[in-house]
């Protein structure tokens, strides 16, 4: 499904179902050097079980045109305009990694227009090492190899991931390379990492939220370790917000490495 947002064409995957304005909407946001496809299993399920799904390609990524966001705040502005273009009075936001920060920032701004915010593989601050930032800028293919080495806890997928024999590590590397090559004007890897590294409004955003929160965290995540989300969790609980925390025994790609557990967490959360 295509929308015109900020003067450019924006692609959203709908899970193979037509958009129904009578249903609630879940808006999925991917991370650095990814696209809508990282949510394929969870988004398609929700689309066939009572939800509208908009799994967006952020500007400059995948099938979406426009300049890629240089900050979390810019991406949150884009989400607000996407909701306006789609005619959404309300939506649930579900974000992974960089996308989780975008979801958090957007929810803090849009307040009652956001019914739920699910943060998958999140951290605050989401620091990126100097070595990885340098590799992302000067040797992006080397950086992609580094990312995937630290992101994954499994080489073979569970049975529910797209079928037996799926190579989750290789598929992730191929996606990263395709998204990188798809935008010759901007280095999407370095730009996204800088946006993560510089975002400083995590705790302030928690203070401004009005919706319930879900954290889905990988127990062996080396990119955004469990402990790196604790500040957000504690801040939200101290404010008396509704907070659910689900940990799964995988790394940074919860959606592919633990698809059923991640979906179960989302289903339970969205039903509240």
What annotation goes with each model-predicted range?
Residues 101-147:
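Flexible "cap/lid" loop of the alpha/beta hydrolase fold
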Residues 223, 250-263:
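Catalytic histidine-centered segment of alpha/beta-hydrolase-like enzymes
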Residues 31-34, 97:
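Active-site glycine-rich loops that stabilize anionic/oxyanionic intermediates
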């Amino acid at each position: 499904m295509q929308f015109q947002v900020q003067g450019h064409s924006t692609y959203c995957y709908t899970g193979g179902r037509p958009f129904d304005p009578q249903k609630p909407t879940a808006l999925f946001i991917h991370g650095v050097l990814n696209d809508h496809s990282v949510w394929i299993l969870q988004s398609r399920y929700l689309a066939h079980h009572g939800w509208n799904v908009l799994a967006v390609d952020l500007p400059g990524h995948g099938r979406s045109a426009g300049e890629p966001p240089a900050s979390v705040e810019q991406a949150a502005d884009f989400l607000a305009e996407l909701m306006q273009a789609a005619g959404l009075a309300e939506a649930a936001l579900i974000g992974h990694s960089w996308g989780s920060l975008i979801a958090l920032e957007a929810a803090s701004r849009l307040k009652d227009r956001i019914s739920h915010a699910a943060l998958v593989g999140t951290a605050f601050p989401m620091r990126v090492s100097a070595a990885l930032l340098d590799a992302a800028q000067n040797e992006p293919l080397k950086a992609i190899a580094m990312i995937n080495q630290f992101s994954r806890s499994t080489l073979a997928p569970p049975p529910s991931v797209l079928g037996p024999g799926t190579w989750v590590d290789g598929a992730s590397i191929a996606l990263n390379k395709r998204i990188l090559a798809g935008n010759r004007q901007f280095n999407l890897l370095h730009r996204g990492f800088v946006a993560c590294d510089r975002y400083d409004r995590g705790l302030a955003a928690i203070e401004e939220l009005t919706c319930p929160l879900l954290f889905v965290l990988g127990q062996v995540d080396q990119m955004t370790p469990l402990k790196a989300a604790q500040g957000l969790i504690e801040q939200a609980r101290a404010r008396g917000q509704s907070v659910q925390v689900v940990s799964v025994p995988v790394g940074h790609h919860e959606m592919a490495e633990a698809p059923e557990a991640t979906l179960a967490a989302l289903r339970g959360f969205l039903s509240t």
